[in-house]
Design a protein with these regions (language model features):
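Hydrophobic transmembrane helix bundles of membrane-integrated enzymes that assemble
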Residues: 1-93, 110-116, 134-220
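Extracytoplasmic catalytic/substrate-binding loops of multi-pass membrane glycan-assembly enzymes
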Residues: 96-109, 119-128, 137-146
Length: 221
C-alpha cells in the first residue's frame, strides 16, 4: 500500500488537495489498525507531511545538494549493514535494535554467518511466512533490500546499485525534478526494512532513468 501511495503522490508531484490528504490519512488508519504495519504507517504520514510542505522541502534539498544527500543516505545504509554484520544475541543494545527492526539484524547476521558475501552473488534458500506450511520450519528471510542485493547479487551488483542511486540523485537535482528525488528517497528509506527496492512491481522510480521526465520539472526553484 505504501508504494501505491508513493506512486500516486509522485504522479501528482507532491501537490495534493484536501480529499487526497483525507484519503491518505484513512489509508494510514487502515494500515495501522487492520494490518498493524507500523513502518508503512509512519512512511505514509511522512509522505503527507512532505506533500504539505513541498515547496519548503524542495528548496531545502536544492540547498543541501546531491553530494550531501548521497553521503548521508550512504552512511545510513552502511551503518545498517555494519550493525547487521556485528550483531550478537548477547548484547542488550543489539537485542533492543533487533526488536525495533523486527528481527532484521538477527536474520541478516545469519546470512553473513552462513553464506557471507561473494563477488558475483549466490543462491540462498529462504523460508518465509507466505504460502501454506504443513510442517514446522525455521523462518529465515532477508528483508533489507540492500543486504539482499549484497548477498544474492554479490559485490558487483551492490556496487552497480550504489552507482545507479548516486546517478539518479544527481540527475534529479540537475533536471530540477525534486518530486522524483523525493520518491527515490522514500523508496530508499523504505528499503532499509523491506525487500522491494529492486522490484518494479513496487518501486517504479528506476524507470525514470530511461524516460523523458519533463512533466515532473519544478516550477519554483
Amino acid at each position: 500500500i505504501f508504494y501505491i501511495s508513493l506512486a500516486y503522490v509522485t504522479l501528482k508531484k507532491f501537490r495534493l488537495r484536501l480529499p487526497e490528504y483525507i484519503s491518505l490519512l484513512a489509508i494510514c488508519a487502515f494500515i495501522y489498525f487492520v494490518t498493524d504495519t507500523k513502518v508503512d504507517t509512519l512512511l505514509i504520514l511522512l509522505l503527507i507531511v512532505v506533500s504539505a510542505f513541498y515547496n519548503m522541502v524542495m528548496k531545502l534539498l536544492y540547498r543541501i545538494g546531491a553530494n550531501t544527500i548521497t553521503l548521508v543516505a550512504g552512511a545510513v545504509v552502511g551503518i545498517e549493514i555494519v550493525l547487521t554484520y556485528l550483531y550478537t544475541a548477547n548484547s542488550r543494545i543489539f537485542n533492543i535494535m533487533d526488536h525495533i527492526l523486527s528481527g532484521r539484524l538477527k536474520y541478516g547476521h545469519m546470512a553473513f554467518k552462513d553464506y557471507n558475501v561473494t563477488m558475483f552473488g549466490q543462491f540462498i534458500k529462504e523460508y518465509a511466512n507466505g504460502g501454506i506450511h504443513k510442517e514446522k520450519f525455521n523462518y529465515f528471510f532477508i528483508d533489507v533490500s540492500y543486504l539482499r542485493v549484497l548477498m544474492f547479487g554479490g559485490i558487483v551488483a551492490f556496487v552497480a546499485l550504489v552507482i545507479m542511486l548516486i546517478y539518479l540523485v544527481n540527475k534529479f537535482i540537475h533536471d530540477k525534478t525534486i518530486c522524483l528525488l523525493l520518491a527515490l528517497l522514500f523508496a530508499a528509506l523504505s528499503s532499509l526494512i523491506d525487500q522491494h527496492l529492486m522490484e518494479l512491481s513496487y518501486n517504479i522510480i528506476f524507470i525514470a532513468m530511461l524516460t523523458n521526465n519533463d512533466y515532473f520539472k519544478d516550477k519554483l526553484v
